[in-house]
UniProtKB/Swiss-Prot annotation:
One Gene Ontology CC term in the entry: membrane
Function: Small multifunctional phosphoprotein involved in virion morphogenesis, egress and counteracting host innate immunity. Plays critical roles in the final steps of viral release by interacting with host TSG101, a member of the vacuolar protein-sorting pathway and using other cellular host proteins involved in vesicle formation pathway. Also acts as a viroporin and forms ion conductive pores allowing viral particle release. Impairs the generation of type I interferon by down-regulating host TLR3 and TLR7 as well as their downstream signaling pathways.
Region (Interaction with host SRC, HCK, FYN, PIK3R3 and GRB2): 95-104
Record lineage: Viruses, Riboviria, Orthornavirae, Kitrinoviricota, Alsuviricetes
Compartment(s) where it occurs, according to its Swiss-Prot or TrEMBL record: Host endoplasmic reticulum membrane; Host cytoplasm, Host cytoskeleton; Virion; Host cell membrane
Topological category with respect to the lipid bilayer: Lipid-anchor
Name of this protein: Protein ORF3
Record remark: domains: The PSAP motif is necessary for the release of membrane-wrapped virions from infected cells.
Residue ranges of the region described as Interaction with host HPX: 28-68
Phosphoserine sites (modified residues): S71
Organism from which the protein derives: Hepatitis E virus genotype 1 (isolate Human/India/Hyderabad)
Record InterPro entries: HEV_Orf2
Amino acid sequence: MGSRPWALGLFCCCSSCFCLCCSRHRPVSRLAAVVGGAAAVPAVVSGVTGLILSPSQSPIFIQPTPSPRMSPLRPGLDLVFANPSDHSAPLGATRPSAPPLPHVVDLPQLGPRR
C-alpha cells in the first residue's frame, strides 16, 4: 500500500508500542490507547498522560483525546455549573447530615515471636 499507518500516530501494529517509549509511537497530545482484552492503567510516559496497556498480540489503536481546556462540558453538567444550588457548602466544609465516623480502637502491640 505504501502508506505508513504510524505516520499520524493513530494506528500501530508494533508489539512493543504499548509502552509508548519510542519517538515513532509517542504522539504530541494526550493519549487513550485501546487494546482488545487488555486492562488499562493510568500512567505518565515521557510527560504525556494517557492509558498504558498490558502487552497484547492484537494491534494497538492510539487515539488522541481532547485536553481538558478544549473539551466541551458533558450534557447536563452545564446545568450544574450554570445554576449553583443554595445548599452547596464551601470547599472543605462538612455537611451536618453526614454520619459520624466510627471510633478508633487501639490494638495491643504484638511482641517479637520467640
